[in-house]
């Protein structure tokens, strides 16, 4: 049984990965959406400098927005073509959701969380201090993972909406704001050299709850769709 | 109790009795609370007369959070037991909650000008209440943007449950972060026995809180009754159309 489930999951991951690479416009748009505003922010920063603390907070916000861009397409093609319905009948929705989540994390959340702290230093023209960079990278990575988990649920939530892109923005961003508040708090503490673990552990707790809750909730919603 | 109210007929009978009583209590308590707050309570030694906006701002903020908790409870009840009345309550709760959140934000901004010198600061309390307003709006938009009514109710219920994480953030934001917004004066029953606010100012606030509670109760019940009536009309219309 477990071997069969693992094979199903492996098959779906391979499929998702192929689809993702065959449509480079989707993920490239998200990556460019992240890099471009950050580069423009760097330009603006050269004219009117802002503090390193403010800069890293703004870049956290752009990371969440870049992730948001990729969410609308997550289930849409499969739903419109009827494949999602077939997977539901074959009881494979759970494996599909896990596969989509893993591919989203590997292809977008991880690159964004690696790029984030690199770009922070590039844009703010600060000397690299590993003691600051490493905690910052951790904050970016955990925020990106939490946002990806939340993104999967909200993408399914807005699938049947009449104007899904707009509804997705209205639903995803308010839910993301608590995450951003704690991530910005942790980032600020990391930059100032104070204890960043309390806000970061809230983010980790959020992620752990997400890991348990996201798949059954998303599966329930996808099963409800006609 | 929840299961007894799940029957729409019984809910309509019971709410028809509760609504007028709740409205009368809201008006009477509101009049007493406003008289106590605007006339009898002394002015604040620092803020002067401007503090009197508290008698609208604080109960509105309490209700904004209470209505979201009620929305979450109704949503959970709908998802678990499929109670149609719970769905009607949830559908009615988000516009009422959005209105009270907007009142709390606007009165807070008006109060902020004389006491802080600015109408708005991006501190944790104000931002988390603004997020609450966006959550209510997201709930309303999601409900109306999905064509299948039952599907819309289920998805909006999930959104409402996800948004519950914001409530503890609002409640404890003034303790967790250094905010310009003052900490709660009566955050628990223990603090109620020894509040950081003078008794002459406190009792009108509590009376206004009770008045707002009855007002909200009446509004939520009326909104649910309206939704039930709307559904009955639709069923009648469909039956008539087929006949």
Give the role of each language-model region.
Chain A
Residues 2-30:
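Aromatic- and glycine-rich beta-strand/loop motifs that create alpha-glucan
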Residues 24-45, 58-65, 109, 171-182, ...:
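Hydrophobic alpha-helical transmembrane segments of multi-pass membrane transport/permease proteins
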Residues 46-54, 117-139, 187-200, 225:
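Membrane-interfacial helix-loop-helix connectors in multipass membrane proteins
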Residues 55-75:
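Long, hydrophobic alpha-helical segments
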Residues 86-94:
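Short helix-to-coil transition segments within interhelical loops
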Residues 93-120:
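Selective transmembrane-helix segments that form parts of the transport pathway or gating/packing helices
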Residues 140-173, 223-226:
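A structural motif at transmembrane helix-loop-helix junctions in multipass membrane proteins
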Residues 208-226:
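Junction motif at the cytosolic side of a transmembrane helix
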């Amino acid at each position: 049984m477990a071997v069969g489930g693992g094979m199903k999951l492996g098959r779906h991951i391979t499929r998702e990965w192929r689809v993702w690479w065959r449509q480079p416009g989707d993920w490239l748009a998200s990556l460019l959406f992240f890099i471009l505003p950050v580069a423009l922010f760097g330009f603006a920063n050269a004219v009117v400098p802002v503090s390193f603390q403010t800069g890293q907070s703004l870049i956290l916000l752009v990371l969440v927005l870049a992730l948001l861009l990729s969410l609308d397409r997550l289930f849409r093609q499969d739903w419109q073509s009827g494949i999602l319905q077939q997977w539901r009948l074959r009881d494979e929705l759970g494996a599909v959701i896990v596969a989509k989540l893993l591919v989203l994390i590997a292809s977008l959340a991880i690159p964004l969380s690696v790029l984030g702290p690199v770009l922070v230093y590039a844009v703010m023209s600060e000397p690299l201090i590993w003691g600051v960079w490493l905690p910052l990278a951790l904050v970016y990575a955990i925020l990106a993972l939490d946002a990806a988990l939340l993104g999967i649920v909200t993408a399914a939530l807005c699938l049947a909406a009449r104007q899904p892109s707009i509804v997705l923005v209205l639903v995803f961003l308010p839910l993301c704001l608590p995450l951003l508040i704690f991530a910005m708090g942790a980032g600020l503490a990391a930059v100032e050299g104070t204890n960043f673990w309390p806000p970061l552990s809230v983010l980790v707790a959020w992620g752990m709850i997400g890991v348990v809750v996201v798949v059954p909730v998303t599966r329930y919603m996808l099963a409800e769709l006609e | 109790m929840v299961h007894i109210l799940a029957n729409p007929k019984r809910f309509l009978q019971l709410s028809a009795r509760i609504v007028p009583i709740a409205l009368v209590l809201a008006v009477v308590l509101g009049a007493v609370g406003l008289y106590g707050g605007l006339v009898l309570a002394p002015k604040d030694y620092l803020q002067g007369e401007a503090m009197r906006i508290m008698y609208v701002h604080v109960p509105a903020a309490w209700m904004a959070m209470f209505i979201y908790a009620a929305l979450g409870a109704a949503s959970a009840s709908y998802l678990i037991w499929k109670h149609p009345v719970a769905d009607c309550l949830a559908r009615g709760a988000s516009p009422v909650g959005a209105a009270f959140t907007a009142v709390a934000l606007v009165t807070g901004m008006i109060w902020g000008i004389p006491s802080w010198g600015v109408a708005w600061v991006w501190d944790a309390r104000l931002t988390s209440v603004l997020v609450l307003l966006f959550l209510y709006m997201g709930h309303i938009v999601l409900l109306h943007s999905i064509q299948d009514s039952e599907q819309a109710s289920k998805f909006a219920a999930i959104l409402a449950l996800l948004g519950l994480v914001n409530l503890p953030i609002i409640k404890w934001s003034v303790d967790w972060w250094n905010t310009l917004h003052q900490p709660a004066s009566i955050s628990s029953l223990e603090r109620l026995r020894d509040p950081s606010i003078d008794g002459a100012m406190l009792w009108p606030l509590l009376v206004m809180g009770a008045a707002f509670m009855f007002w909200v109760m009446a509004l939520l019940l009326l909104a649910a009754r309206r939704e039930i009536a709307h559904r009955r009309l639709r069923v009648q219309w469909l039956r008539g159309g087929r006949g």
